[in-house]
UniProtKB/Swiss-Prot annotation:
Designated gene of the protein: AMEL
Record-given protein name: Amelogenin
UniProt-recorded Gene Ontology molecular function terms: structural constituent of tooth enamel
Transmembrane segments: none
Keyword Aminoacyl-tRNA synthetase: no
SMART domains: Amelogenin
Disordered: annotated segments: 86-196
UniProt feature, compositional bias: Low complexity: 88-120, 137-182
A GO cellular component entry from the record: extracellular region
Family as reported in the entry's similarity comment: Belongs to the amelogenin family.
Signal peptide range in chain numbering: 1-16
Function: Plays a role in the biomineralization of teeth. Seems to regulate the formation of crystallites during the secretory stage of tooth enamel development. Thought to play a major role in the structural organization and mineralization of developing enamel.
BP GO terms, sorted: enamel mineralization
């Protein structure tokens, strides 16, 4: 328990101690969230509004120039935007020119293409002789033609026959209606299917009662009705 109390005291002391000197900083932390850091710089540098997060951001970046306007708009300072320090640019990003690495893929040397036409006497899949000097030369047969050549006989020219005159086209006769090959036959009568639900007469809710005579309004007619 005493350790937690000591830790809480040290934490409160760290927040209560004045901050190290910083340009544009009054030396204390104001935990008010009513004004932002950029507005306080433009309004009054003596009453600077800072929070621990805003003080840390002001330590790692240069403060806004006091031109009387904000460069990024009024809504930016309500969001946490991590900004890298511009005072110490990384040195490993810039390489000397002789250490430049090409971005594109390395170009492979172009292999000269061999002719696709097979050499007579050699198969396209078998290697040539000059690539195998130690092997004995194989017996090669002379290139033979698949069919013996025959002398071309001169053809006798036949006399050209006269062209016959074209006959006139006959008129097309109307097509007669043909009887259908398979006349439509009436289907045989099908048997009636039994009803799915049996239709039984439902008993009337009110039984049929004989109508009663209306009572006569006149005394003389009442006797006749009775």
């Amino acid at each position: 328990m005493g350790t937690w109390i000591l830790f809480a005291c040290l934490l409160g002391t760290a927040f209560a101690m004045p901050l190290p000197p910083h340009p544009g900083h009054p030396g204390y932390i104001n935990f008010s969230y009513e004004k932002s850091h950029s507005n306080a710089i433009n309004i009054d540098r003596t009453a600077l509004v800072l929070t621990p997060l805003k003080w840390y951001q002001s330590m790692i970046r240069q403060p806004y120039p006091s031109y009387g306007y904000e460069s990024m708009g009024g809504w930016v300072h309500h969001q946490v935007i991590p900004v890298l320090s511009q005072q110490h640019p990384p040195s490993h990003t810039t390489l000397p020119p002789h250490h430049h690495i090409p971005v594109g893929p390395a170009q492979q040397p172009v292999v000269p293409q061999q002719p696709l036409m097979p050499v007579p006497g050699h198969h396209s899949m078998t290697p040539n002789q000059h690539h195998q000097p130690n092997l004995p030369p194989t017996s090669q047969q002379p290139f033979q033609q698949p069919f013996p050549t025959q002398p071309v006989q001169p053809q006798h020219h036949q006399p050209i026959q006269p062209i016959q005159p074209i006959q006139p086209i006959q008129p097309i006769q109307p097509i007669q209606p043909q009887s259908p090959l398979h006349p439509i036959q009436p289907l045989p009568p099908q048997q009636a299917l039994p009803p799915m639900f049996s239709m039984q007469p439902i008993a009337p809710l009110l039984p049929d009662l004989p109508l009663e005579a209306w009572p006569a309004t006149d005394k003389t007619k009442r006797e006749e009705v009775d």
